[in-house]
């Protein structure tokens, strides 16, 4: 009798890295201390006992590089490779279509090399209880709303948070959210919590760590190298 996976992770790694300059390959393949950014992310999910399977959403142009990374670092949980879509929303939908029904789906950005195991575990447990969860950190900067070159409002940041990763969902909650988006013709959602809220669901906030940042620009990459060095010296948890 086949066993049913309890937790499946969809790791999004199909981007082209258009905002990351000076590299001839997408940023997920750029190295930090001789190791691809994507590999740091996959290390975490490979080592977590609660993760049963990883679906890797890829940039098909660089398909062989993904195979090489998984082979080199021995990622046994990566069982499925799925071509990404033209938007993040479409890429997640394709990953969701590629998995069998399970209890919890974890959606993770592949260019967040230092997502904490604690945050992932707590987000999974929160999704079991509330249906969906999002790892967030406090917004430290003042956020302003700008229109036509002028600041029109300054929201109170007391209740503002930056969405990090992962986002976690009961399988049926995420499936329903994407089905609702397709029916409503909603496109271009920047994350899946947005879709769950639009479909009438609730999303639990799970406090994360500032180390779970996303590498988007060259400055982020330089910062990641410093974070790695600080970890090695025991300056960070």
Model-derived features: positions:
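Hydrophobic C-terminal alpha-helix "anchor/cap" residues
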Residues: 42-46, 70, 99
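SAM-dependent methyltransferases
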Residues: 1-10, 191-193, 197, 210-211, ...
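Conserved core of the sugar-phosphate nucleotidyltransferase
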Residues: 114-206, 237
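Short phosphate-binding loop-to-helix
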Residues: 71-103
